[in-house]
Amino acid sequence: MKTRQELTEVLDFIAEYATYLLGSGVHTSRVIRNSQRIGASQGVDLQLSSFQKSTIITAHDEESGEAITRVVKIPALPVSFERNSDLSAQSWDALDEGLPLSEIRKRYDELTAKPRIDPIFVLLTVGLANASFCRLFGGDWIAMGIVFTSTLVGFAAKQRMQAHGVNHFLIFIISAFMASLCASAALRFDCSAETALATSVLFLVPGVPLINGVIDIVEGHILIGCSRLINALLLIICIAIGLSATLLMVKDGLL
C-alpha cells in the first residue's frame, strides 16, 4: 500500500514521462501502454486521456483506494525516433526488472539529457533526401542540385525561426516560400523546373502528425486523432500558401 506522498511521486514522474512522449511525436496508444507499464512496476493502476494540448492522468492505488489526478500540459518537442524508442524500452525495463522509482527517474534523466543529432548534419541529410525526391519524381541532376540548395535555405530558415519561438504556422509559410523561391532559379536553366519547384517544399510535409492522427483514430482515440489531422491539414495549407506566393511571382516563367 502506498502513501499519498508516494502515489504523488509516481504520478508526477509518469505525467512528465507521458507528456514528453506525446510532445515528441508518439501516438497515444503507445504512450498509454508505456505509462501503464511503469505504473504497474510501482503497483499503481494508471488511466490516461490525452488531448492536443494537455493530458489527464489518474493514478489509483487499489490497496488503499487512494486516487490522484493531474492535468498536464504537453510540451512542443522535436521528433526523435531514437529517443522515443529508448524511452519505450525503459518502460519494459522498469516492469521486467522491478526497478524502484528513483532508478527509473535516473535512467529517464540520462536518456532525455543525451545530446540530439547535430543540426548541421540534419540540415545536410534533409537536403539530400529532398533532392532524392526530386530524382524520384523525374528531376534531372541540375534540378536535384537546385532542390538540394533550396532545401538548405528553407530548412535553415525553419531551424532559426523555431529557435526564436516564431509561430509554427508562420514558419511553414515562410520556409515554403523561401525554398520554392530559391527553386524557381531552375527556370533559368535547361532542366525539369516544374519538378524542382514542386519537390522543393516536400521536406515540410507533416508526416508524423498525419500518421499519428490516423493511428489514433483507428485505435479509438478520436479527439486527439482528429485534432492531429486538422493540425497537419493547416500546416499543409501553410505550405501551399508559401508555394503559391512563389508561383504568383514567377508565373510568367512557367508559361
Locations of regions flagged by a protein language model:
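Alpha-helical transmembrane segments and their cytosolic membrane-interface
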Residues: 76-143, 231-240, 251
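Soluble N-terminal domains of membrane-associated systems
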Residues: 1-99
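Core alpha-helical transmembrane segments of integral membrane proteins
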Residues: 115-188
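N-terminal charge/polar-biased segments
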Residues: 1-12, 113-114, 239-255
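Generic detector of multi-pass transmembrane helix bundles and their immediately adjacent loops
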Residues: 188-255
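C-terminal ends of transmembrane helices
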Residues: 107-111, 153-165, 211-224
